Amino acid sequence: MTKKQKKMLLRIIIAAVMLAALYFLPVTGWLRLGLYLVTYLVIGYDILKKAGQGIANGRVFDENFLMAVATVGAFALAIYEKSGDYNEAIAVMLFYQVGELFQSYAVGKSRKNISALMDIRPDYANIEQDGKLVQVDPDEVAVGTVIVVQPGEKAPIDGVVVEGSSTLNTSALTGESLPRDVHEGDEIISGCINMTGVLKIRTTKAFGESTVSKILELVENSSSRKSRSEDFIAKFARVYTPVVCYGALALAVLPPVIRLVGGMDGQWEQWIYRALTFLVTSCPCALVVSIPLSFFAGIGGASHEGILIKGSNYLETLSQVRTVVFDKTGTLTRGVFEVTAVHHSDMDEQKLLEYAALAECASSHPISKSLQRAYGKAIDRSRVTDIQELSGHGVTAVVDGHPVAAGNSKLMEQLGIPYHDCHSVGTIIHMAVDGQYAGHIVISDVVKPHAKEAVEALHKAGVEKTVMLTGDAKKVADAVAAELGVDEVHSELLPGDKVDKVESLLAQQSGKAKLAFVGDGVNDAPVLGRADIGIAMGAMGSDAAIEAADIVLMDDEPLQIAKAIRISHKCIGIVYENIVFALAVKFACLVLVAIGLADMWAAIFADVGVMVLAVLNAIRALRVKK
């Protein structure tokens, strides 16, 4: 608990003890009134102060005003009737403060997940000067400076490892508990915790432009983007509160006047009591508090899972998504070419890969890199001579004295070497050694391990249609879509075509149905901005993705998309539950109070009880099912 919460709890305990003691103490008259007033001021002085400040600032109709009028009125009525029963006035204030404390605790609990994210903010950076480590403000570190990150410290700025190796804990950024190993030459993202070895990192960005700064700015600004539900409740409260105040005034005045006109006793005390009870019942705290809290808890729960939502308006829009459009590369596939098969080779597969990797050793093409990775050993260029790169065909070289050709079917035809066609999906590298066909190697963009499961999870989460956009050839795109179960695929698209295709898909949406576009943040900014909701995957370290997207997934796990949608559904469900429950109980109790069938204790339940239940329901949004 915070210092403020502890102080409030102490006031509640003191007031409760004093109220219980006064109930049994045989004191009467002015002494009794004085003791009850002291108890009332202990528990309610801050509410009276806020109500007074509100009146002075022209903001009369709020919950503080309602509580102040109701409790002061109850005191005045008890004094007028000389009943000495001041318990109800104090009980109303006491239980109201209990509700406020509970609400404060709930907000604090939901802030913990945001605070955990805020813990990624580094306090300092280590710079080596004259053989000693000096701590400096991260803002003062220039781009290109070598900083030292010791075990247990956070990486303060994005950079590249120039010395050392270690294991990083990225859970605060991605929600993923599995550590990541880094070595010399690997990129480091600010906010990660160094767990084992000492790392020397050359910074590639200024602190203000680093990943951690971008994320913190995003989270800090999320509360400023209100959902339609929050706007509705805020507008509703601005109209509702004055209406019920005037309604209470009418309830206190009109029935007695009508009775007097009819020649009956006005029963002023009875109707004023009902009006005061009406005010307590009508307090809109349950709605005003629980609705923003539900969204706040939803955003907090999502952030704990490595899902950063820029505002409650995006959370609300996400709950209405019925079409999810993927940019294939980097979302459903890894975007990295890998050797997936070796066919029709009488030669040992590893030997064929060795010939291919050595023949392609002078090329920086992604296909060449994938062959070298599949070979898995250091390339000895002294074994290779006479390398010739034939544009659009492949390469020829002499490896260990053997003529080697590696390329497409055109190269085989040019060399007059018979070859086998391949029906596998991917890029086919035909190999010839010593003028004889040696087989072919299949290279393709690898589908992510959980991509198929992610598409299925989206349908279970209420998504009606999944669409894949790609610049790949139709054969490749159709094969990936069929493997993953994607409903619709559009292939051979240029970057500009993707925006047009999303425009077309948006035009097909009906009613409140929304469209989400999922990209990896690379060249996706126009499409991310055009969709109803833009989701960037694997955005750790991508400034463009964090800027352009409405929702940022900090790792590249496609299952996170369905999880984000489930979080939004749960959050919006809680919001609607609270609205219906609070309004139903409020209006029912208001009617019962007006006709004299509910007293002040029923009003306390309608106010504090409903608020506590609504807040309890709201903090359910913090819990995210795995």
Q: Which residues are covered by each model-predicted region?
A:
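Soluble-to-membrane junctions at the N-terminal ends of transmembrane alpha-helices
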Residues: 1-16, 34, 48-75, 216-250, ...
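Conserved catalytic phosphorylation-site environment of P-type ATPases
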Residues: 57, 63-71, 173, 273, ...
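Conserved cytosolic catalytic loops of P-type ATPases
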Residues: 116-209, 313-356, 398-399
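Conserved ATP-binding TGD loop and adjacent catalytic N/P-domain core of P-type ATPases
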Residues: 401, 427, 433-577
